[in-house]
């Protein structure tokens, strides 16, 4: 789980900003907190409110950049993806800093790094304990210092120690050490790297980033057409949200007649042929529809996802293409796998513009379902929004509500409602927010200039 996230000098964040999911001392809505892990309580959700272009999406991108650099790394010869605050000449020369405080496998870790386009300047991983911190590794590139003494103690055999020392020295200056550990088959050479595995696994399997145009787990959606248990779950949620859709079904179609450009067809076939299995498959979203594609005996076979609707005048059903459904229904198809994963536990979802294409009441119900059915699991839902109706203390605790602001000189900053304002637990926040009492809303200039502009059109 994510307990804290820190970002500095990234996109519109000039200064150090701290996002904390540690709960305040309030006793309301105890079900919004996880069970204590090593004496640490963590909030299960947080909503970031703010005006357009205020920095909300940059906040999500900041969380994503660490995941990207850990999992994908930087290609040999390329510069690191570096996006400093550009409205300050000083900041363009400074490093970006990204820090995660996470709880996983009953331990608390701090993983962070500072970097620029040319190098990872600092990188460290610590286990945070009550009495003292344990440095698992740390590096400072410019001083050519790399401390892996803790890992060497855990792996005292000469060949293991030699391999770890070699790996540390061989880590390129534009690459994170954590990425090197992940990308090399280190388990064949080193026996005890549980701490590294835990943190890498958190980035790989727990942290999920979803942007407005990001489909989530399309394969699960297609699998739901054939898997009875998934089909039942999808159908129940689609009916619960009153979409008019009763389920999903796959029908065979001719891949060659889908209108896919020849170069894309060749690329798909090449990708599928790289699979080591006898029957390779993948998903394809094309022309507003979703397909399951297989490579069988060198030929691409395709199945199209259809939605099932009951006819009003008999017991038969009608099949619709996904492209025939509303934007809201299509977006809900992305969220149903998310909901199922949240309830199962072990996931940290960070969603940008969660309300996109969905009615506010539906979003509120998704959040309510999450709180109700995830009491005993360690999942988190963090999202950005400018939907004011969600700023509601019947839905959230005060310490779950965050406000994103951008100054007149383009600097974004954020803060938590309970730290910024002394509001009663029963105060209706929406009207105060819309009236600009908390900031984080659009600020308009005087109309003098546009009045002159519009007058020229008459």
Describe the residue ranges of each PLM region.
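Extended helical coiled-coil dimerization/tether regions that scaffold
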Residues: 216-324, 447-448, 452-453, 457
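Glycine-centered tight beta-turn/hairpin loop motif at sheet-sheet or coil-to-beta transitions
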Residues: 12, 104-108, 130, 312
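Electropositive, glycine-dotted interaction segments
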Residues: 110-270
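An N-terminal domain-start capping segment
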Residues: 1-15, 148-167, 285-308, 443
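A short, compositionally biased
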Residues: 1, 93-97, 116-121, 298-304, ...
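Conserved P-loop NTP-binding catalytic core
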Residues: 37-41, 47, 51, 60-120
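Switch/communication elements of ASCE P-loop NTPase nucleotide-binding domains
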Residues: 1-71, 302, 306-446, 455-458
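Short Pro/Gly-enriched beta-strand edge/turn motifs at strand-loop
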Residues: 80-84, 286-289, 383-387
